[in-house]
Structure formats: C-alpha cells, structure tokens
C-alpha cells in the first residue's frame, strides 16, 4: 500500500484532452457530411410556362411594330401619291400627265441618289473615325501577314528606292590606288637583302655616318 501511494505521489497527473471549439467542429461536420442541394423556389414546369409567356409577348410586340410600320408607309404613300383623276381627259391631256409623272419620277430618283451618296459618305467617315479611335487606344486589328520570299537587293530597292544602288556600292568610298604608284614603290624598295648587305660592315657604318 505504501509503494502504491508513493508511485501515485511521484508520477505527474495525465494532461487533459484539448478542448475543441464548437464552431470548428460544426464546420468540419458540414464539410465532410453530404448535404442536399438547395432546391429552387420555382419548379421546372413553372419556368417553362414563364418562358413561353415571354416569347408570346415578344411575338405580339413584333407583330404590332410591323403593323405600325405598314400603317405609316400607307399614310405616307397616300399623302405623297394622290389618286389620279383620269375621267374626261383627252389624248393630249393624258400625254401631258404622263410627262409630269415621268419628270416627278426622275426628280425622285435624283433625290434618292443624293441621299444614298450622303449615307455612303457618312458610313465611310464613321468607319475612318472608328479606326482612328482604335489606333489611339492601341486596339487595332492587325492584318494577317503572308510570308513572301524576296532578295536583299529587292528589299533595299523597295525600302530606299533609287538610293538603293548608291548605298549598295560599297567600293565608291574606298581610296583608289593607281597601279603605277605601286610599281614605283617596288622599284624603289628593291631587294631588301642587298640593302642589308650594303649597310653591314665598316662601309655601311661609314655610309650611315656620312648620311
């Protein structure tokens, strides 16, 4: 009994188990355990019904806009193209009326041509301004480049034009040496061994002293 009490008194008590937070335990349980996905509040049949209703409304709006355009076109034609009164007109009067109608048609064609020219000009200006904006922003579309085989002479000709031949003539800036001058120098130098023999010995020293 004494030994057991001594061993119990000498050994330290066991450390308590770490206490885990309730929030972390709940998070682990939620992450590990499978859970059902949240169901949508609207069923599939209800979604299909709403889509069908939206398509029907859009179709009705398009039909109404087309009917309004047809009505506007009819009103414009009725105001501009009045009905002809041909009752009681003679042959000469009918000819005059035809001439007036042809003149009016020609005038309308001229106006239509002018309007088309203005529209084309405006479209071109808009395209140019849009391209300038893209160039300033640095977002221009690069064209596709094709690989072309070209020689160095043709490339220099394309870049420099008439100056290509002048720039390629590299010997034009070099110093030209005449053949007669080189032969004269060779004659003056002569054989170098004879010069060494002439300057060696007492005679050579005498020549150096006298020179």
Curated annotation (Swiss-Prot):
GO terms for biological process: cardiac muscle contraction; skeletal muscle contraction. Signal peptide: none annotated. One of its GO terms (cellular component) is troponin complex. Residues 33-80 are annotated as: Involved in binding TNC. Keywords: Acetylation, Actin-binding, Muscle protein, Phosphoprotein. Residues 130-150 are annotated as: Involved in binding TNC and actin. Coiled coil: none annotated. The record marks 81, 98 as: Involved in TNI-TNT interactions. The modification Phosphoserine is found at residues 5, 23-24, 43, 45, 78, 151, 167, 200. It holds the Pfam family Troponin. The modification Phosphotyrosine is found at residue 27. GO terms for molecular function: actin binding. SUPFAM superfamilies: Troponin coil-coiled subunits. Residues 1-23 are annotated as: Disordered. The modification Phosphothreonine is found at residues 32, 52, 79, 130, 144, 182. Binds to actin and tropomyosin. Interacts with TRIM63. Interacts with STK4/MST1. Troponin I is the inhibitory subunit of troponin, the thin filament regulatory complex which confers calcium-sensitivity to striated muscle actomyosin ATPase activity. Belongs to the troponin I family. This is Troponin I, cardiac muscle. The gene is TNNI3.
